[in-house]
Swiss-Prot record:
Keywords: Acetylation, Cytoplasm, Nucleus, Repeat, Ubl conjugation pathway. The keyword Acetylation applies. Interacts directly with the 26S proteasome. Interacts with NUB1; this interaction facilitates the linking of UBD-conjugated target protein to the proteasome complex and accelerates its own degradation and that of its conjugates. Interacts (via ubiquitin-like 1 domain) with the spindle checkpoint protein MAD2L1 during mitosis. Present in aggresomes of proteasome inhibited cells. Interacts with HDAC6 under proteasome impairment conditions. Forms a thioester with UBA6 in cells stimulated with tumor necrosis factor-alpha (TNFa) and interferon-gamma (IFNg). Interacts with SQSTM1 and TP53/p53. Can be acetylated. This is Ubiquitin D. The lineage of its organism: Eukaryota, Metazoa, Chordata, Craniata, Vertebrata. GO terms for molecular function: proteasome binding. GO terms for cellular component: aggresome; cytoplasm; fibrillar center; nucleoplasm; nucleus. The keyword Calcium does not apply. The gene is Ubd. Induction: Rapidly degraded by the proteasome. Cell-cycle regulation with highest expression during the S-phase (at protein level). Over expressed in hepatocytes by drug injury (e.g. DDC; diethyl 1,4-dihydro-2,4,6-trimethyl-3,5-pyridinedicarboxylate). Inducible by the pro-inflammatory cytokines tumor necrosis factor-alpha (TNFa) and interferon-gamma (IFNg). It holds the Pfam family ubiquitin. Belongs to the ubiquitin D family. SUPFAM superfamilies: Ubiquitin-like (SSF54236). It comes from Mus musculus.
């Protein structure tokens, strides 16, 4: 059985975070715990053990951490740039026609739906848009969907009738 140890994560921006881990846990589990408390996406986190950057796919044991030791980590947050990213809108009708959209990570879903209306004539109310397997929801921003350059948006429309 894997021994349980305490992990303490400190950051300039948040209060001290403490939780339990085992040597078989991956660093990504710590990243996910931090995300649940801070809303900082895993891709925007850098965890440091002393000056060594921890890689999300590796187990804690691969860093030679003593079983009995409390792990003290430092969280750094990388602010992603807010430049315009080229995304491709794929329509479910019109033989999968593609449209290039230039979207910022800070763009609201409502703004993106207005862009979609300008190229497809489908009003936002009738649009169902998915990105990275998630339905875009009003009130959110595109950073919530982990968009990257070249990400695909899939457009379908609400059916009218029964």
């Amino acid at each position: 059985m894997a021994s349980v140890r305490t992990c303490v994560v400190r950051s300039d921006q948040w209060r001290l975070m403490t939780f339990e881990t085992t040597e078989n846990d991956k660093v990504k589990k710590i990243n996910e715990h931090i995300r649940s408390q801070t809303k900082v996406s895993v891709q925007d986190q850098i965890l440091l053990l002393d000056s060594k950057i921890l890689k999300p796919h590796r187990k804690l044991s691969s860093y030679g951490i003593d079983k009995e030791t409390t792990i003290h980590l430092t969280l750094k947050v990388v602010k992603p740039s807010d430049e315009e990213l080229p995304l491709f809108l794929v329509e479910s009708k019109n033989e999968g026609q593609r449209h290039l959209l230039r979207v910022r990570r800070s763009s609201s879903v409502a703004q993106v739906k207005e862009m979609i209306e300008s190229v497809t004539s489908v009003i936002p109310k009738k649009q169902v848009v998915n990105c990275n397997g998630k339905k875009l929801e009003d009130g959110k921003i595109m950073a919530d969907y982990n968009i990257k350059s070249g990400s695909l948006l899939f457009l379908t429309t609400h059916c009218t009738g029964g």
